[in-house]
Design a protein with these regions (language model features):
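Polybasic low-complexity intrinsically disordered regions
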Residues: 1-151, 157-161, 263
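Generic structural signal of hydrophobic/aromatic residues within well-ordered alpha-helices
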Residues: 4, 15-18, 22, 26, ...
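Charged alpha-helix within mobile-element recombinases
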Residues: 20-25, 188, 192, 228-230, ...
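Alpha-helix-centered segments that form part of catalytic cores
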Residues: 69-88, 195, 200-228
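A glycine-rich, aromatic-flanked flexible loop/lid motif
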Residues: 93, 208-209, 237-241
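Positions that flank functional sites
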Residues: 164
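Cys/His-rich short segments
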Residues: 167-215
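Basic, amphipathic alpha-helical segments enriched in Lys/Arg and hydrophobic/aromatic residues
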Residues: 216-284
């Protein structure tokens, strides 16, 4: 296995070209592939011990067996239940329709996942896909991520962080008749329209500039909720990669080897999906 990985790393350009070719074949089979993209990160505990001290109060370690790994936090696990881990994170953009990976990146666990949302979106576009919506959880809720998606003509579908004492100058307007309702969006003007529920107020409607708190697809709408359900696609894909394709537990060390291991697992996923699509077309 070691010799095989060494030879494969030397042929990295050819291996990357193989991944691109498989993705192109899948895009030809599934025209809607990549239209709605779900982005998230998942932990990959290292094949090493990240404790600073050895057991029973021994001396401090001079170096770790996997120096590229680092301590990170599992966002889906409470800290009281052992949310910290030593290793890596795989950041992935997955098609919400086909559950297939479109772009991915392996990094040390200490890096926040929000740093890789826009690079992943750029990688998806570089592979020939045209994402219209980008679905992420509240860990990605930031002005930079929202504005970056809009600049790429991709509607951000991001759950909002409920921060304490947050200023709300552009919140949805309200009146004595209740909270105003969404009445449409102008994508050219980057604004949303809100209307008085009774129609008695003057003016009866107002336009609000779209921003992180008031996106062009408002969180109050049915469409936003339906799109956000697509975020489960990336969670399902992480589960399949770990349980069925051997992404975890790791048996290699070093960022380069771990990234190659992830590439091989994802290549197997894409190749199997392509084989199934071809089998269906031949049977028909």
């Amino acid at each position: 296995m070691y010799r095989f990985s060494v030879k494969l790393r030397k042929q990295k350009p050819l291996f990357d070209a193989c991944l691109v070719r498989v993705s192109e074949s899948l895009r030809e089979r599934f025209p809607d592939m990549g239209r709605n993209v779900a982005i998230d990160a998942s932990d990959m505990p290292a094949y090493a011990n990240g404790q600073r001290f050895v057991s029973k109060g021994g001396r401090e370690r001079e170096r770790f067996s996997d120096p590229d790994a680092s301590w990170g936090h599992r966002s889906a696990v409470s800290t009281r239940k052992g949310g910290g881990f030593y290793g890596y994170k795989i950041h992935a953009a997955v098609c919400a329709r086909t559950d297939l990976p479109l772009a991915w990146q392996v990094q040390s666990a200490r890096h926040h996942e929000a740093l890789y949302a826009l690079p992943l979106l750029d990688a998806v576009r570089a592979r020939g896909f045209s994402p219209e919506t980008c679905i992420m959880d509240k860990g990605y809720d930031s002005r930079a991520t929202h504005d970056g998606c809009e600049e790429r003509e991709c509607r951000p579908i991001i759950a909002q962080i409920q921060a304490r004492n947050a200023r709300t100058p552009d919140d949805v307007p309200t009146c004595e008749h209740g909270r105003w309702t969404f009445a449409g969006a102008d994508f050219k003007r980057k604004a949303t329209k809100w209307r008085c529920p009774s129609g008695a107020c003057q003016p009866k409607s107002v336009w609000l500039k779209a921003d992180r708190r008031n996106p062009l697809v408002p969180r109050e709408t049915k469409r936003w909720r339906e799109l956000y359900r697509g975020r489960a696609a990336v969670e399902r894909e992480f589960g399949r990669l770990k349980q069925e394709y051997g992404l975890a537990p790791l048996r290699v060390r070093g960022l380069e080897r771990v990234a190659l291991h992830a590439d091989l697992c994802i290549l197997a996923t894409l190749a199997q999906a392509l084989a199934r699509a071809r089998a269906v077309s031949l049977a028909a």
